[in-house]
Amino acid sequence: MRRVTLFLNGSPSNGKVVAVYGTLSDLLSVASSKLGIKATSVYNGKGGLIDDIALIRDDDVLFVCEGEPFIDPQTDARPPGGLLGSHTDWLTLNVGGRYFTTTRSTLVNKEPDSMLAHMFKDKGVWGNKQDHRGAFLIDRSPEYFEPILNYLRHGQLIVNDGINLLGVLEEARFFGIDSLIEHLEVAIKNSQPPEDHSPISRKEFVRFLLATPTKSELRCQCANLQGVKMLCSNAEGASLRLCNFEDPSGLKANLEGANLKGVDMEGSQMTGINLRVATLKNAKLKNCNLRGATLAGTDLENCDLSGCDLQEANLRGSNVKGAIFEEMLTPLHMSQSVR
């Protein structure tokens, strides 16, 4: 008869002395009963896997595992004896067909209210959800799960190139990793390209005009047109709502002689703009700021100027037949218009 001393994997204390009979399966059954675990493998003190009962000698010291890798009791930092609880033992996860080995403490301690913590804080809760290798089955994307597991290990968000942050964010929300969700939302926001608020050049605007069919509307709502020069341009039927034509440096936008028939420029900022002899027939300029604008000789027939600020605007020689001047912000003096 041979006898051996059995210890839990990684533990140097609280061993059990048992007799060795029959096959290796018989020894694993005895170990499971004595140590209160589901024994699947046995190692010697040097980490060698015992796969044959004949390899065991009398008075050998053996370490019993539940499927996790061998842990050397001489170097393992886990607390001894009764402190070796369910929150420090190893387990393997099968996430979408890919295996991850970690500890219960990693899944439980950092985010105790997460789904992973609830799944694994009590030993054996998910015992019926294991594959043939004993790994716990989780039907999620392994590519997005890996950054989450690493975050639970060391507290840093590290995502490899080629992995979509939005995918990691959805997994973090699914597992309830609240602190990681905040990191990911900031990272996604910082990864977005900055908005371009630079002024549009005359060359760029003319290119828009040339690329737009004559029967189609040109839409430039909210464009920044500070100091733009568009002399004699043809923008008939264009939409220029809420555009900014005012340059803080003092350079004034110049649309002298431009064809702006039917243009929608409602709410645009056009202080000091030059619209001399431009055609604005049937245009919509409601609520525009036209302070100091040059509208001399401009065709404003049937133009809607309701709510505009025309203080100090030059309207001499302009055609205001059928123009609408309702709800003006400042009085319109007769000296400003002769026609």
Curated annotation (Swiss-Prot):
Molecular-function annotations in GO: cullin family protein binding
Keyword Repeat listed: yes
Residues covered by the KHA domain: 3-82
KW Phosphoprotein (keyword) present: yes
A Pfam family the protein falls into: KHA
One BP term from GO: natural killer cell degranulation
Residues modified to Phosphoserine: S11
Keywords assigned by UniProt, alphabetized: Phosphoprotein, Repeat, Ubl conjugation pathway
Limits of the BTB domain: 89-161
SUPFAM superfamilies, sorted: Doublecortin (DC), Pentapeptide repeat-like, POZ domain
Pathway of action: Protein modification; protein ubiquitination
Domain of life: Eukaryota
Domain Pentapeptide repeat: 223-247, 253-292, 293-327
Assembly with partners or alone: Forms pentamers. Component of a complex mades of five KCTD9 and five CUL3 subunits.
Reported function: Substrate-specific adapter of a BCR (BTB-CUL3-RBX1) E3 ubiquitin-protein ligase complex, which mediates the ubiquitination of target proteins, leading to their degradation by the proteasome.
Name of this chain's protein: BTB/POZ domain-containing protein KCTD9
Gene: Kctd9
